[in-house]
Every structure is written in C-alpha cells, then in structure tokens.
C-alpha cells in the first residue's frame, strides 16, 4: 500500500459535483475520490446529499483533498464547482473561492454568473457521440480530472472500472476519455482574472 504523505503545510482542495438526481453525480464523485485517495497518495473525504425524489431532485457530492489528515470533511470554500444544470449553478456559485473555477454543462446551463467559467457540452457529447445521455457524468468526470490537476487519468480509469456495471466498461471509458480531451483543450490561465480584495481601495 502506498504510504500517505506527511507534509508540514496542508494544501486543501475542494470540489463539488452538483446537479439533479439521476445524473450520476454521486457516482462520479465517488470515482474521483477513490482515484485520488485509494489509487493516489493524498488524503480525501467524500460526502453527499440529495433530495427525497428518486430522480430530478437536487443532488450534490463533495470531495475534499489534502496532503495532510483532513480535520473537517465538508467543503467550505470550493476550488472547483461542477454544475450540471442551471439550478445547481444558481444555488452553489457563491460557495466558490474568488479564484475558484466554475465548470458547467453548456447544454443545460445557459445563464452564467461569471466570465471565469468553463462551459463544455457534456450532455451533447454523451448523447450524440456515445449514444447514451447517462454517461454525461463520466464525460464531466474526465474534464474535472484534468481541470482540477488533482488526479491522473490512469487512476480515474482504475477507479471507474471498479464502480460501473459489467458490460459498460467500453462506453464509460470512452466517455471519460472524451471528457479528458475536452478538458485538455482549456487553458485556465487565459480565463479572466478573479477580482480580489486588493483590487479595491477601502
């Protein structure tokens, strides 16, 4: 077993997967967390919540990553927010850190609250290229893996293969790789710079 790192300074990184029930966001978050903490070498906590509806209700899952043991498992200030529908974007955008990254499904989120956003066609790729809307979560997962910089594609694949139904491996891996491709096209450094408190005279 790979030993967990012991460092003097913890670097905490928080990700929230959000959308509606039935989009597979909790599964995506679990795969992401296990890729980081089980197959990777960092500490990780994964939590989730969802509405009483089986499908269509609110759904969110959080992953907290650190180089040191995590003292509080809930996200406090998000480094990255994935919003897979408009309601999630509206509800959780203000939980982002000023320099945090908003990632949305461009097919389902039309009203963007900031120009510092990555909008990618997760649902359209899943539907039109792979033939199953249900794997939009895996397309998004691939992009999040790249954009977060917290996990390798290899470890995402390893984690994914332990969590998906037998017989769906090729479809899900294809979806993951398409997300990786889309995420790799994005240069975060070219996004608008966030406004910080130092930008204002008080």
Language model features: what each stretch is:
Residues 2-202:
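Active-site cofactor/cluster-binding pocket
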